[in-house]
């Protein structure tokens, strides 16, 4: 876990990524509370609320909305936790629509190589599935999870995987964030 050089950066964004129903929102909220920092909710939840279907244009609009919401909050804060970012949206897009999107790939690359450092917490789907209207499939979580490490590695992203109980996840995640902040 390479620490962030606070003198030479404009803050830190910690994105919580993983398959659906793998504890991303719970962890983002807990980290925000622990570090007294803001968190950016998953944009797709508001965008898709009350809808029964979506298409590729919707997923790209969600990506743009997630990115803009994150930028607005990050501009005013040194530390920000993000519940889902373009890594999740890229995997969702590629699985759902069967291929890459050049804009999405370029935006993801730009976010990873921006002046503001970005680190990742990858949540393991080792917790029970909880149904809700926006979740699509309780049985594909392991297969989706298997896509994250190779993508994060390919992108050269710095990440820590978290698993286990809420307490174990929070303990591992806070340790990672402290290491990244050099605290």
Predicted regions and their residues:
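Hydrophobic anchor at the beta1->P-loop junction of P-loop NTPases
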Residues: 16
């Amino acid at each position: 876990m390479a620490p962030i050089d606070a003198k030479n950066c404009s803050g830190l964004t910690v994105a919580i990524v993983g398959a659906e129903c793998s504890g991303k929102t719970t962890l983002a909220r807990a980290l925000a509370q622990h570090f007294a920092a803001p968190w950016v909710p998953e944009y797709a939840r508001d965008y898709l609320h009350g809808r029964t279907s979506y298409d590729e244009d919707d997923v790209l609009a969600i990506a743009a909305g997630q990115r803009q919401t994150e930028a607005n909050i990050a501009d005013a804060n040194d530390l920000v936790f993000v519940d889902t970012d373009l890594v999740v949206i890229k995997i969702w897009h590629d699985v759902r629509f069967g291929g890459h999107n050049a804009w999405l790939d370029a935006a993801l690359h730009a976010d990873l190589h921006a002046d503001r450092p970005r680190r990742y917490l990858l949540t393991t789907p080792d917790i029970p599935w909880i149904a809700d209207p926006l979740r699509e499939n309780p049985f594909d979580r392991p297969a989706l999870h298997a896509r994250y490490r190779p993508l994060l590695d390919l992108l050269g992203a710095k990440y820590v995987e978290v698993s286990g109980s809420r307490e174990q996840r929070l303990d591992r995640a806070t340790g990672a964030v402290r290491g990244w902040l050099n605290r």
